[in-house]
UniProtKB/Swiss-Prot annotation:
Record protein name field: NADPH-dependent 7-cyano-7-deazaguanine reductase
Family statement drawn from the similarity comment of this UniProt entry: Belongs to the GTP cyclohydrolase I family. QueF type 2 subfamily.
Top-level taxon of the source organism: Bacteria
Function field: Catalyzes the NADPH-dependent reduction of 7-cyano-7-deazaguanine (preQ0) to 7-aminomethyl-7-deazaguanine (preQ1).
Pfam families: QueF, QueF_N
Residues the record lists as binding NADPH: 93-94, 259-260
Gene3D superfamilies assigned to the protein according to its UniProt record, in alphabetical order: 3.30.1130.10
Transmembrane intervals: none
Quaternary structure annotation from Swiss-Prot or TrEMBL: Homodimer.
Catalytic reaction list: 7-aminomethyl-7-carbaguanine + 2 NADP(+) = 7-cyano-7-deazaguanine + 2 NADPH + 3 H(+)
Any one Gene Ontology BP term: tRNA modification
Binding site for substrate: 91-93, 230-231
Amino acid sequence: MNKELEIIYQNIANQSELGQSSNYDDHYNPKRLYPIPRAPKRQEINLDPNSTTFYGFDCWNHYEVSWLNSKGKPVVAMAVISYDCHSPCIIESKSLKLYFNSLNNTTFPDVETVVQTISKDLSHCIGSEVAVNVYPLSEIASQTIYAAFDGICLDKLDIECSVYHVMPDFLSTSSELVEEVLYSDLLKSNCLVTNQPDWGSVQIIYKGKKINHEGLLKYLISFRNHNEFHEQCIERIFADIMRFCQPESLTVYGRYTRRGGLDINPIRSTEPCVFDGQNIRLIRQ
């Protein structure tokens, strides 16, 4: 990371509540939300922040949603939050957790008001429309939990690893033209600010010259000691594969384990995509 970016993200660390002790609000407080601009990290990996050559969404699942009904009785639910990858900002995850905690003792007349309030606040925070769905537990009791992504699992490859900082030079192709769906459960990086581990699974769908599987797995494992937010890691993987492997089409989909009741699931693609039907829940989630 260059010096300018270090200063930007140090300011984020100082101004946000990541890595700091926090007080919890007794009542609704949208001021707890903290945006983080996408542009600086995209410039670092040569992704034009204003480009329309890639598409995607960030989807968050929140498993600890609660408020009070008009009689003061607690309601519990789950929320699905999604927004386009071209929003100017992402939401800092701890600030989202603190915001949702501020709803715990707040009275709402109905779930529609809860949804409208959350959508309005998050859209204002990131400068782009945010879709919010809130589900009572009865509606998601039958939700399927998948053991793994579809595709060929790279993790069965018997490779030797010694590089744990991002190394795109591991990426290479042969002349054979293929369409493949690959995945790994070995993705691990660290939070850019707190250095806490982020655990995830990643699926790679592409068409083009065949990517060397061993090299791709080594590349994914090389994120192990890398410090970046979830969304930035998935965009870096997308950008590196596009640069070093030059596929005709590419989709990179990350699903991370939860922290503070939240999991983050970014998807980036060369193709226009919608998130409907994509929000599968993996076994570690």
